[in-house]
Amino acid sequence: MENETHKAEILAQVMEKFDKNQCALVERMLSIMSNPVRFHILCALEKESFSVSELMVLSKSRVSNVSQQLKMMTLAGYISKERQGKQIIYTLKDGRIRELIHKLEELFGESR
C-alpha cells in the first residue's frame, strides 16, 4: 500500500509539472524538431544566422521546401527573420531550442 501511495505521489508531481498546456508545448516543439530538414536548419541556426539560399544548400532542399519549413518555425516563434538588403536572414530565437540541441549533441553526437 505504501508503494502505491509513493507511486501516486510521483504521478501527481509529474502531472503538476507537465500539465496539458505544458504537454502541448513539448509536443509542438518535438514535432517541429522531428522533421530532418527543420532539425538541420535549427542546428545550423543554433550556431549562426543564415539566409534562405544558405539554408537551401545546407539542407540540400529546394527553396520552396526550405521556405515552407522556415515559415512554420517562424510562426511557432522558434526563429526570427530580418531583412538585410535583398536577403532575409533567419536567427534562432527560442533559447529552449538551443538548450535542447546542446543536450541532443551531448547524447547523440558523433562520438557515440
Regions found by a protein language model. Give the residues of each.
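N-terminal helix-turn-helix DNA-binding core of bacterial DNA-binding proteins
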Residues: 24-64, 88-95
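Residues within the DNA-recognition helix of helix-turn-helix
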Residues: 69
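Beta-hairpin "wing" of winged helix-turn-helix
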Residues: 74-84, 91
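Residue-level signal for well-ordered alpha-helical positions
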Residues: 103-104
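An amphipathic, aromatic/His-enriched active-site/gating alpha helix that lines ligand/cofactor pockets
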Residues: 107
